Every structure is written in structure tokens, then in C-alpha cells.
A protein has these predicted regions:
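Secreted, luminal/periplasmic, and some membrane-associated catalytic domains
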Residues: 2, 6, 20-161
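Glycine- and acidic
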Residues: 1-8, 187-192
């Protein structure tokens, strides 16, 4: 339990009361939806992805005094942006790309295997999974999608940032962080099942409740009603 455990419980108790008051003000035929876009978990370590890449020989920096993406040298094989996005320094795509297209698949798979093998300071894998872009993205903007997306195990926060760091693993002021799982969804309408639902379902559901016509093909999710 954290230092302010009791204070947070009291905060949520008061917030719950306000939600109850709002519910009482709604007409009987009005549906209330309460949703969060993430869950929570304990934070043990921050993982500085670009520092890990630097120590693995995958990223190098220009000696220009800058501390951003423009500081990544043409000798680099890849870099990371938050949250857990990894880009291969691909020729003719990146500003100073040097990985040839014919080598792309092998380089990407090598990085993926390296990421999956990372262990934390206390043992245990840092990454829950590392996905290739074509398995999770589609559409007209694929050219700007990351080449790999890393999902951490609970307790690890994937950081980016450029420039040399003292350590690959660090600790910040927080002891909690967001997760992609365990988000909350409440729909107080009889007959609605939220089992297996996700964020993609929220907008179509709201549009259906408001009797607004829409083209289902433009959404990845479906209405829950």
C-alpha cells in the first residue's frame, strides 16, 4: 500500500457519490456510460529503451549538443519512442536511414528477439510481448506505424528519451502506472453485455444510443447495443 492509500480510497468514495447524484438527475430512458481508457498496476522500474539500444550497439548519437531524434546518427540501426514503439532506421524512410529494405525483415526479427530476452534487475522478463506492425495496424497510414510494439509486463514502464543515461533501469517518483488491460466500462442499460469489449466499441455504442446514423466500415469496433 502506498503512502496515500487511505486518501485515494476517500477520493474515490466521494467521486462515487457524485456519480450517484448525476445518475439520479438522469431521465429513466437515459443510459449512463462510464469508461476509462486504461487500467493501473504497480510500477517498479522504468526501462530506458534507447539507452538499452545504445549499449547493445543499435543507436549512436551525433556530437551536436542536441538531445532529440535529430541527434540520432546515420550509423544507428533503430530507435524507440513512447510507449514501447520501436523503429528500424530504414533507408529511404528515415531521415538518415541505413538499413536496406532487403535486410529489413531480418533486422526487425533480430530486434524483436532481443527485446523478448530482456530481464529486469530482479529477474523475470521485461516484455510481455513484442508485436510486428502488420499484425496490429492496418489502413492508409501504415508507413508511419512503428515496426515493433513492445508491451511490458506489470511493473515496468517503457521510456524513450534520447541521449546517454546512467542506467538502463531506473526509478522515478511514481509507484503506479497505466496498463492496457483492466480498464473499466459501465453501461447501465438492460441487456447490454460488455464481456470481451474494448475501447473500439465505445464510439459506435454512443452513436447508436443517440440514434445517429454512421457508416460501420469506418470504425474498428461495433456497437454493444
Amino acid at each position: 500500500k502506498g503512502r496515500y492509500f487511505k486518501e485515494f480510497l476517500e477520493f474515490y468514495r466521494i467521486l462515487d457519490g457524485y456519480i450517484g447524484q448525476l445518475k439520479e438527475l438522469l431521465a429513466d430512458d437515459t443510459t449512463m456510460i462510464i469508461a476509462s481508457d486504461h487500467g493501473f498496476t504497480e510500477l517498479k522500474y522504468e526501462f530506458h529503451a534507447n539507452e538499452w539500444l545504445r549499449r547493445a550497439g543499435w543507436i549512436d548519437y551525433r556530437k551536436n549538443g542536441k538531445n532529440g531524434l535529430e541527434n540520432v546518427s546515420s550509423e544507428s540501426m533503430g530507435y524507440s519512442l513512447i510507449p514501447g514503439r520501436f523503429y528500424i532506421n530504414l533507408e529511404d524512410r528515415e531521415l538518415d536511414g541505413n538499413v536496406k529494405l532487403e535486410d529489413y525483415e531480418n533486422v526487425r526479427e533480430e530486434l524483436r528477439e532481443m527485446l523478448l530476452g530482456i530481464e529486469g534487475p530482479e529477474g523475470g522478463k521485461v516484455m510481455k510481448s513484442v508485436e510486428v506492425n502488420e499484425d496490429i495496424f492496418e489502413g492508409d497510414q501504415m508507413e508511419i506505424a512503428p515496426d515493433l510494439v513492445a508491451l511490458p509486463n506489470d511493473g515496468f514502464d517503457l521510456k524513450a528519451g534520447f541521449g546517454e543515461k546512467k542506467d538502463v533501469f531506473g526509478k522515478g517518483p511514481r509507484n503506479g502506472m497505466h496498463t492496457f488491460e483492466n480498464a473499466s466500462l459501465i453501461i447501465d442499460r438492460p441487456g447490454v453485455s460488455i464481456e470481451g469489449s474494448n475501447l473500439y466499441n465505445i464510439t459506435p455504442t454512443i452513436l447508436t444510443l443517440m440514434n445517429i446514423k454512421y457508416d460501420p466500415s469506418v470504425f474498428d469496433g461495433e456497437s454493444l447495443i
